[in-house]
């Protein structure tokens, strides 16, 4: 907001005195801070009181969804997600930055190409989405190491603490990433409005000071020193009050916390356990941070799923549209003002970036699927709530009351929480007292209104709350000067147009609803049947009752048109902001929100703008669709949909109507089994002629890992030697005495890892993996060895990613990968000298384009054969569907062409066949050099792997590379490998440019 000069002088005086002050403007209390940079920012751009944020002086609710750019590395598709978030009625996206991807080598920060954040920020601005930046340095995020690069395993200090070694290690990363964020702050015309230092800094143990104000202040100062001046917000993992304003050093500007109340039991998606619905968040907020707006920086939008889990379809069922209605509206009962859903779009754990407990997909059961589809009902349900919040500013200034089972509803089976407004309307959140109830409950309400206390319905009948449902009833709700005394039907949106006002209400199937309006005007049904609609005129109001119908009815009361919809019909409505200068909708300011039009258009409406006499809509279609536009400006004469002039009609109510035909294109995909597959053995290490002289020697007599002491003569921890990702290989040399009978080995790779062991060329056995096992002790019988002869033990270990570091003091991120211990029977451990390798170069990784985690330590990966156009001319012809006849690891490469039609968004999937009794094998699939599938046949669950356009060349040549690791003496093979697609979407997204896909080039020093 703009301050008067007198107010500004007072603030400057307070600044000079080094004091923070409070001032009141338009009835709201704002806090100004003594820090000059912060104070200057807050008085102009982002301020707050105890109710909400203000952006440029305008009160706003932040409704946000989490989206990680590193999990969708195609820039044009990032814009797609932003536009789908904007279409929900949301105004913000929260994002993490994964440190491990941009500083793979200490001191070398690389944020270019697919890791460049600036196109992500530009796309947010184009879509009109604010950003909450969360760069860590620790992020958790179900990412390898919680976002920590593997080399932190060597830091001589406690991670996430004020130990100097750790703080020094973070400086390079934070100084760079925070400077980039600072460049794109709202103060510089960018979209970033909030900055979160650290992440879920909530739990400590093991004698470490916690919470450590010195540490938290250091992280905050890192951001400030890099130029970050926007407010700092935190996300306590629970509502514990850590680092809340007023707690001293390390306090943030705005306190926030996380909540995942329904948990992560996707195996039982219909079970809502007793007591899981939060009821005390408002009370805790008033105790912990009463001067800041109530913020939940991560509220449950889905669930993770582990190796061997039920799959994300089950997670989306657990956290479905019913969950949203009950839990999100419950959050509204606490007057939440900053609400971020984790996740809104999950994406993909491509290239080994995930943590060990999760698989390639990070779909998360979120509203937008991993393949960017929005057909989950939870997306549409979320759109109803997002648009309601967008047009209900009175919600932010109402006063929340206590939940009650008496006083409002006539049954104790229902609980009502009031948010009472003075002149800005009141809101009543109604739910079942047993929140998990699947019963339908009939009820009447008695609500305080400007017309007195009213028992509703007045015209007879009862209201109904169906099972696992919740409603927000409004009273004295302002529709641009028209007072809605009450409405039991829920508000989707309302708008004031040049020729009148429009209010859109909806209800569930079979429900009866009623509203009352302060007016002396009569009720006229101007569209649809009058059947089921009743009304009554009083001296100062009109009351309307109706039964919800699947057929739209429109009633007119004075200059107000009211659309009466059922919920499923409301799902098809969109409220795009109407741009009049350019094509971008802009950010969600009150002026921009007021400019919106209402469009019924099915699958997706991205944008709307005026150009000359044309109204332009950009929209996506997955079926032939009738398009209707409500509130068309009088200057518009022609309709353009996706750039094409489209004939339209105008009905008596001024609604424009048109039809978009959907004619699905012919999609021709290659048969992957019939490609010209070439094969090379990618475990030459078990051949007698193999030379490992170029391998790093595992000869460190001490580890730099402070978590676990060595139990071997030299360190066999991979991160001691710079190997942090993908498959690890070890070769142990010894000279036999002839008395060795067994070899025991303890390997560690994280949940669901596997390992295999050979003696020279003889297969000894494998650990095929279980989700519950992060390490495994195995003992293998040896054949009779010849005294004096040299033998080599070859060990392959699947590094599933590094552990997260959630609890400060445990330092679990330092949990080593590799060999923990071994025993050659009858021999001292020193009898074996070891070498090891992972990805070629380790921290001096070869592929700077695809990043430090994408490739592992297999021979073919070290050579770069997984990249396009490997030197396969003289390789053997063989397919992964033929596979291997014995234990080992094969590498397969083939190319194919795609020629998919432009203007269509066609989700493509790699599908790996799986039987009920598969042989144990592990597969990696590289697409144009990017690892986009990691499959474990005996664990699962994922068999279908989305691969986005831009990674796949939709109109060009593509290269597939498959590594097949058979962990059984009988070998293994893929039962099938197919490319498939789901419903093509006629899209307005535009051209998608392929990411950089460097081809194979002989690597210097590759072994």
From Swiss-Prot:
Glycosylation sites noted in the Swiss-Prot or TrEMBL record: 156, 402, 422, 478, 522, 622, 739, 760, 777, 805, 914
Substrates-to-products reaction catalysed: Hydrolysis of terminal non-reducing beta-D-galactose residues in beta-D-galactosides
SUPFAM superfamilies linked: (Trans)glycosidases, Beta-galactosidase LacA, domain 3, Galactose-binding domain-like, Glycosyl hydrolase domain
Alphabetized SMART domains for the sequence: BetaGal_dom2
Signal sequence region: 1-18
Binding, substrate: 96, 140-142, 199, 364
Gene Ontology terms describing biological process: carbohydrate metabolic process; lactose catabolic process; polysaccharide catabolic process
Outcome reported for the amino acid change (mutating residue 298 to Q): Loss of hydrolytic activity
PROSITE patterns: GLYCOSYL_HYDROL_F35
Effect of mutating residue 304 to A: Nearly complete loss of hydrolytic activity against lactose compared to wild-type due to decreased substrate affinity
Keyword vocabulary terms for this entry: Carbohydrate metabolism, Disulfide bond, Glycoprotein, Glycosidase, Hydrolase, Polysaccharide degradation, Secreted, Signal
Residue positions of the active site: 200, 298
Name of a matching Pfam family: Glyco_hydro_35
Locations listed in the record: Secreted
InterPro entries in the cross-refs: Betagal_dom2, Betagal_dom2_sf, BetaGal_dom3, BetaGal_dom3_sf, BetaGal_jelly_roll_dom, Galactose-bd-like_sf, Gly_Hdrlase_35_cat, Glyco_hydro_35_CS
GO cellular component terms, semicolon-separated: extracellular region
The keyword Transferase appears for this protein: no
GO MF annotation, one: oligosaccharide binding
Database matches in PANTHER family: BETA-GALACTOSIDASE RELATED (PTHR23421)
Family of this protein: Belongs to the glycosyl hydrolase 35 family.
Additional record remark: Mutants of this enzyme have improved transgalactosylation activity and can be used for galacto-oligosaccharides (GOS) production in vitro.
The protein's name: Beta-galactosidase A
UniProt source species: Aspergillus niger (strain ATCC MYA-4892 / CBS 513.88 / FGSC A1513)
């Amino acid at each position: 907001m703009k301050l008067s000069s007198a107010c500004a002088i007072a603030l400057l005086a307070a600044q000079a005195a080094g004091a923070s002050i409070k001032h009141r403007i338009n009835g709201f209390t704002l806090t100004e801070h003594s820090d000059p940079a912060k104070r200057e920012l807050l008085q102009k751009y982002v301020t707050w009181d105890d109710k909400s944020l203000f952006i440029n002086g305008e009160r706003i609710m932040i409704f946000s969804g989490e989206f990680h750019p590193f999990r969708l590395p195609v820039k044009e598709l990032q814009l797609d997600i932003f536009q789908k978030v904007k279409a929900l009625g949301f105004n913000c996206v929260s994002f993490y930055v994964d440190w491990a991807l941009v500083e793979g080598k200490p001191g070398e920060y690389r944020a270019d190409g697919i890791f460049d954040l600036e196109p992500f920020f530009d796309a947010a601005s184009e879509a009109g989405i604010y950003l909450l930046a969360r760069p860590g340095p620790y992020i958790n995020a179900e990412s390898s190491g919680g976002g920590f690069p593997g080399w932190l395993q060597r830091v001589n200090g406690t991670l996430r603490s004020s130990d100097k070694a750790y703080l020094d290690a973070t400086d390079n990363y934070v100084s760079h990433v925070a400077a980039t964020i600072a460049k794109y702050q709202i103060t510089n015309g960018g979209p970033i409005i909030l900055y979160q230092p650290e992440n879920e800094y909530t739990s400590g143990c093991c004698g470490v000071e916690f919470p450590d104000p010195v540490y938290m202040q250091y992280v905050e100062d890192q951001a400030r020193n890099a130029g970050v001046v926007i407010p700092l917000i935190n996300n306590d993992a629970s509502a514990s009050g850590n680092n809340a304003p007023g707690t001293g050093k390390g306090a943030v500007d705005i306190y926030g916390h996380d909540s995942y109340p329904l948990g992560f039991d996707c195996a039982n998606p219909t079970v809502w356990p007793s007591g899981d619905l939060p009821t005390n968040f408002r009370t805790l907020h008033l105790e912990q941070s009463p001067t800041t707006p109530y913020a939940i920086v991560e509220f449950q939008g889905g669930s993770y799923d582990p190796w061997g889990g039920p799959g994300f379809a089950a997670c989306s069922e657990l956290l479905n549209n019913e969950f949203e209605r009950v839990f999100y509206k419950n959050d509204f009962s606490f007057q939440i003002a900053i609400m971020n859903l984790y996740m809104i779009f999950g994406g993909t754990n491509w290239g080994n970036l995930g943590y060990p407990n999760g698989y390639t997909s990070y779909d998360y059961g979120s509203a937008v699927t991993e393949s960017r589809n929005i057909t989950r009902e939870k997306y549409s349900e979320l759109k109803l709530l997002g648009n309601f919040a967008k047009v209900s500013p009175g919600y932010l200034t109402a006063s929340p009351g206590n939940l009650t089972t008496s006083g409002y509803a006539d049954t104790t089976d229902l609980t009502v929480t009031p948010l009472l407004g003075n002149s800005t309307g009141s809101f009543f959140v109604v739910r079942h007292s047993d929140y998990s109830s699947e019963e339908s409950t009939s009820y009447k309400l008695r609500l305080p209104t400007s017309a007195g206390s009213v028992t509703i319905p007045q015209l007879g009948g009862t209201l109904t709350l169906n099972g696992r449902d919740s409603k927000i009833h409004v009273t004295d709700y302002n529709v641009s000067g028209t007072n809605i005394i009450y409405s039991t039907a829920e508000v989707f949106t309302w708008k004031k147009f040049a020729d009148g006002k429009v209010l859109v209400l909806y209800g569930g199937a079979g429900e009866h609803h009623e509203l009352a309006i302060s007016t002396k005007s009569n009720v006229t049904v101007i569209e649809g049947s009058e059947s089921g609609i009743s009304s009554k005129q009083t001296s100062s109001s009109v009351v309307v009752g109706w039964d919800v119908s699947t057929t739209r009815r429109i009633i007119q009361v004075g200059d107000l048109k009211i659309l009466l919809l059922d919920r499923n019909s409301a799902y098809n409505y969109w409220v795009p902001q109407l741009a009049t200068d350019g094509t971008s909708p802009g950010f969600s300011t009150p002026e921009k929100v007021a400019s919106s039009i209402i469009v019924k258009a099915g699958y997706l409406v991205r944008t709307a703008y005026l150009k000359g006499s044309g109204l332009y809509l950009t929209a996506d279609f997955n079926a032939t669709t009738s398009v209707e536009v409500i509130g068309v400006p009088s200057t518009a004469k022609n309709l353009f949909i996706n750039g094409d002039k489209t004939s339209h009609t105008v009905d008596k109510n001024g609604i424009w109507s048109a039809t978009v035909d959907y004619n699905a294109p012919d999609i021709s995909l290659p048969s992957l089994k019939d490609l010209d597959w070439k094969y090379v053995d990618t475990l030459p290490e078990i051949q007698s002629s193999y030379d490992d002289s170029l391998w790093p020697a595992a000869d460190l007599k001490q580890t730099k890992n402070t978590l676990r002491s060595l139990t071997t003569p030299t360190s066999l921890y991979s991160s001691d030697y710079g190997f942090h990702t993908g498959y690890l290989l070890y070769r142990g040399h010894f000279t036999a005495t002839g008395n060795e009978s067994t070899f025991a080995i303890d390997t560690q790779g994280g949940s669901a890892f596997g390992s295999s062991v050979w003696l020279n060329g003889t297969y000894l056995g494998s650990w095929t993996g279980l989700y519950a096992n992060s390490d495994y002790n195995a003992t293998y019988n040896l054949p009779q060895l010849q005294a004096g002869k040299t033998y080599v033990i070859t060990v392959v270990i699947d590094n599933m990613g590094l552990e997260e570091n959630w609890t400060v003091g445990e330092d679990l991120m330092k949990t080593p990968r590799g060999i923990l211990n071994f025993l050659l029977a009858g021999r001292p451990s020193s009898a074996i000298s070891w070498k090891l390798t992972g990805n070629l170069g380790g921290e001096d990784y070869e592929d700077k384009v695809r990043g430090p985690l994408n490739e592992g330590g297999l021979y073919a990966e070290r050579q770069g054969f997984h990249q396009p156009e490997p030197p396969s001319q003289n390789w053997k012809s063989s397919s992964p569907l033929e596979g291997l006849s014995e234990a080992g690891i094969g590498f397969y490469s083939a190319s194919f062409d795609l020629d998919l039609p432009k203007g269509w968004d066609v989700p493509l999937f790699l599908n790996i066949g799986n039987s009920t009794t598969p042989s144990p094998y592990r597969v990696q699939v590289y697409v144009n050099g990017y690892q986009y599938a990691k499959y474990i046949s005996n664990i699962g669950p994922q068999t279908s792997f989305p691969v986005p356009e831009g990674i796949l060349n939709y109109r060009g040549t593509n290269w597939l590379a498959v590594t097949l690791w058979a962990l059984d003496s009988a070998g293994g093979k893929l039962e099938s490998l197919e490319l498939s697609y789901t419903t093509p979407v006629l899209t307005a997204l535009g051209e998608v440019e392929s990411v950089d896909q460097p081809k194979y080039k002989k690597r210097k020093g590759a072994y």
